[in-house]
């Protein structure tokens, strides 16, 4: 299938049809940058989906963290069930980069733990981009980090079709070059096995499907897709494309050329260090690099091989590394979600990485070429990005400058809900007034969100409200993911009436039951009380038809003035639209997606076990590995029903871990 097809009971409504038309008109007129100013609850994701369907272009959606990326991925997958919706984020559950602290003469080795499920999804994403056009890839900012060359990745692909001739030994050798491992006993992702005239391949982009190649001599007769757990045949395939088990696969000739390049740079660097009278650094660099060269010669790989990536990709010093952007077709479309956060994040990535590696190079731990194993500079990202739509309720200065301040607004909500009423009250005696407002709000059956400036104040306020017998909880940065979701569940169900936080009541926290957002010390100018922060926080009350926001301030700051004026402007537009179309605003309850994932876990594990697993990534990985072994053991004992149950539990845990990462 080459066309995008939305499967949904909803049609564009409110501002959505106009916004979709305007963005598409801008794309058609070759505008490189546009802004979709979408307020909370206006249906930004659904609007993006309709733009994708109508333009029918491969799309990359960038989000500023894994959690937001997972939410968008889940929503897009439900909207486009017949198309390729993929997920591309960092595959590390844990990552400690190598570093050297000169002050204490401490070298920290690289240490990491790779999430197999996310690695699988990364392979599925690059594969889809090379195989088809109806592709949406939802990514975190990790898409600007170095990836294997798309040219080599595609060049080394093995294309299999029934009726063609494939010399057996050559095919097995090709699979090994693709970094597939022969394993006739334990058959898992990234492996192949040989049984008589059959070769079974477990592709790197599947978790529950494998391919069986049936040969007559050297002729490939059939390709069957089968369940690797039960052995049941699922489908007969007309062709199969086997891509590398790593994005860094390369032919032997490339490895040989790289080794020559590394040796040449090593000699130049050693001469330089000697001229600087640095015997320790000279000896250290020579020893470490010679060991890596020996490993590359013998195995084609070495620990930290990514630090030599420039030699494998054929790039010159200082040139940008290949990234996911090079896998995108020329006519691809880019959405940058919550761009007011994502764009500064992209800008910051290069400098932090560079500072750490310069120290390693200076002290003889790495060759200067290691500096080219890096994320894209902001200027490079700016050059590589295709036509872009920046999506935010509060666009940043870069986006506004790129578009000349022109925005496409999504202000009318399909539900008819208005932006909340904003009330400014004196900060003097703010707690006393807050308690009165809390009583009024709770009496209506609504919940209250309170945002403070400091952790100490949040803790003290929570304790004080609890003393007054209010059902109060405190949300802060040290709350683990699972506990955070539990708190949100308790808030929505009424177990908690009041939630106190600092900077956690902004993007992505949608509570329809919230009738009041109280912003304490709103006149203290700064990051937490900037125009952007205030507008985002005000938006938390926009899911409720009776939602109100109280800003406690003794003076009117520029940020308060702009935030309240903008909210009032939007509210008036919404009121006029509702009056014209006879719409009565109504609160719509919506399940928090991550909450649904938590319920899934809860049904499989007891609460204590769930907390233990999700508070400790290492224990979660161990538990998943244990389940895999139990599943394979059950299958080998022909206990397929038990194996299927374990597989379902395993899938639930892996999906939940992805959602909650």
Curated annotation (Swiss-Prot):
An example GO BP is: SOS response
Q: Which domain of life is it from?
A: Bacteria
UniProt free text on domains: The beta-hairpin motif is involved in DNA binding.
Record-linked CDD domains:
DEXHc_UvrB (cd17916), SF2_C_UvrB (cd18790)
Protein name per Swiss-Prot or TrEMBL = UvrABC system protein B
Q: Which HAMAP family match?
A: UvrB
Query: Assembly and interactions?
Result: Forms a heterotetramer with UvrA during the search for lesions. Interacts with UvrC in an incision complex.
Chief location bin: cytoplasm
SMART domains of this UniProt entry? DEXDc, HELICc
Q: Which UniProt keywords apply?
A: ATP-binding, Cytoplasm, DNA damage, DNA excision, DNA repair, Excision nuclease, Helicase, Hydrolase, Nucleotide-binding, SOS response
Query: Which species?
Result: Rickettsia massiliae (strain Mtu5)
Task: Say yes or no: keyword Nucleus present.
Answer: no
Q: Which residues bind ATP?
A: 38-45
Q: Which GO terms describe its cellular component?
A: cytoplasm; excinuclease repair complex
Where does this chain carry the motif Beta-hairpin? 91-114
Listed Gene3D superfamilies: P-loop containing nucleotide triphosphate hydrolases (3.40.50.300), UVR domain (4.10.860.10)
Tell me where in this chain the UVR domain is found. 621-656
Its annotated compartments are:
Cytoplasm
Q: What does this protein do?
A: The UvrABC repair system catalyzes the recognition and processing of DNA lesions. A damage recognition complex composed of 2 UvrA and 2 UvrB subunits scans DNA for abnormalities. Upon binding of the UvrA(2)B(2) complex to a putative damaged site, the DNA wraps around one UvrB monomer. DNA wrap is dependent on ATP binding by UvrB and probably causes local melting of the DNA helix, facilitating insertion of UvrB beta-hairpin between the DNA strands. Then UvrB probes one DNA strand for the presence of a lesion.
């Amino acid at each position: 299938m080459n066309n995008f097809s939305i499967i949904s009971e909803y049609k564009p409504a409110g501002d959505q049809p106009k916004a979709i038309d305007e963005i598409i008109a801008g794309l058609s007129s070759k505008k490189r940058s546009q802004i979709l100013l979408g307020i909370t609850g206006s249906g930004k994701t659904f609007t993006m989906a309709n733009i994708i369907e109508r333009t029918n272009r491969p799309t990359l959606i960038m989000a500023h963290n894994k959690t937001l990326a997972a939410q968008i991925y889940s929503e897009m997958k439900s909207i486009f069930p017949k198309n390729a919706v993929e997920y591309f984020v960092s595959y590390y559950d844990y990552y400690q980069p190598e570093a050297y602290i000169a002050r204490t003469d401490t070298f920290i080795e690289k240490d990491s733990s790779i999430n197999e499920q996310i690695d699988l999804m990364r392979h599925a994403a690059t594969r889809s981009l090379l195989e088809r056009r109806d592709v949406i890839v939802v990514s975190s900012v990790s898409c600007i980090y170095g990836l294997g060359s798309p040219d080599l990745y595609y060049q080394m692909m093995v294309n299999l079709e029934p009726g063609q001739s494939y010399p057996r030994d050559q095919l097995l050798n090709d699979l090994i070059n693709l970094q597939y491992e022969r394993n006739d006993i334990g058959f898992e992702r990234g492996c192949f096995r040989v049984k008589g005239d059959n070769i079974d391949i477990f592709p790197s982009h599947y978790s529950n499907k494998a391919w069986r190649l049936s040969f007559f001599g050297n002729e490939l007769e059939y390709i069957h897709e089968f369940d690797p757990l039960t052995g049941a045949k699922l489908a007969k395939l007309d062709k199969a494309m086997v891509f590398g088990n790593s994005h860094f696969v390369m032919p032997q000739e490339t490895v040989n050329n790289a080794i020559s390049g590394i040796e040449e740079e090593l000699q130049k660097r050693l001469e330089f260090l000697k001229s600087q009278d640095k015997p320790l650094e000279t000896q250290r660099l020579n020893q470490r690099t010679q060991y890596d060269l020996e490993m590359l010669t013998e195995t084609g790989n070495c620990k930290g091989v990514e630090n030599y990536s420039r030699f494998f990709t054929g790039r010159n010093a200082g040139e940008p590394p290949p990234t996911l952007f090079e896998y995108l077709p020329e006519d691809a479309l880019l959405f940058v979600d919550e761009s007011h956060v994502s764009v500064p994040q992209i800008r910051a990535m290069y400098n932090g990485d560079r500072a750490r590696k310069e120290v390693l190079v200076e002290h003889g731990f790495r060759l200067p070429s290691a500096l080219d194993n890096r994320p894209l500079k902001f200027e490079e990202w700016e050059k590589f990005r295709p036509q872009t739509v920046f999506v935010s309720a509060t666009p940043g200065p870069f986006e506004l400058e790129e578009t000349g301040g022109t925005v496409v607004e999504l202000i009318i909500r399909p539900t008819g809900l208005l932006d909340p009423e904003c009330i400014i009250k004196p900060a003097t005696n703010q707690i006393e007034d807050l308690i009165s407002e809390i009583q009024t709000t709770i009496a209506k059956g609504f919940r209250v969100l309170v945002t403070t400036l400091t952790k100490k104040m949040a803790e003290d306020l929570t304790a004080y409200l609890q003393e007054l017998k209010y059902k109060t909880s405190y949300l802060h940065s040290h709350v683990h993911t699972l506990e955070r979701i539990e708190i949100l569940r308790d808030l929505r169900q009424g177990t908690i009436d009041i939630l106190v936080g600092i900077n956690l009541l902004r993007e992505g926290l949608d509570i329809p039951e919230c009738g009041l957002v109280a912003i304490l010390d709103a006149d203290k100018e700064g990051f937490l009380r900037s125009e952007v922060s205030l507008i985002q926080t005000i938006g938390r009350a926009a899911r409720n038809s009776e939602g109100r926001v109280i800003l406690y301030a003794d003076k009117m700051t520029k940020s308060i003035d702009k935030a309240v004026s903008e909210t009032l402007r939007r509210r008036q537009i919404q009121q006029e639209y509702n009056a014209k179309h006879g719409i009565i605003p109504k609160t719509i309850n919506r399940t928090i997606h991550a909450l649904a994932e938590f319920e899934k876990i809860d049904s499989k594990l007891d609460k204590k076990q769930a907390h233990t697993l999700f508070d400790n990534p290492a224990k979660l990985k161990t538990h998943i590995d244990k389940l895999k072994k139990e599943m394979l053991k059950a299958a080998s004992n022909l206990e397929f029903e038990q194996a299927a149950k374990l597989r379902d539990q395993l899938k639930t845990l892996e999906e939940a871990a992805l959602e909650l990462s």
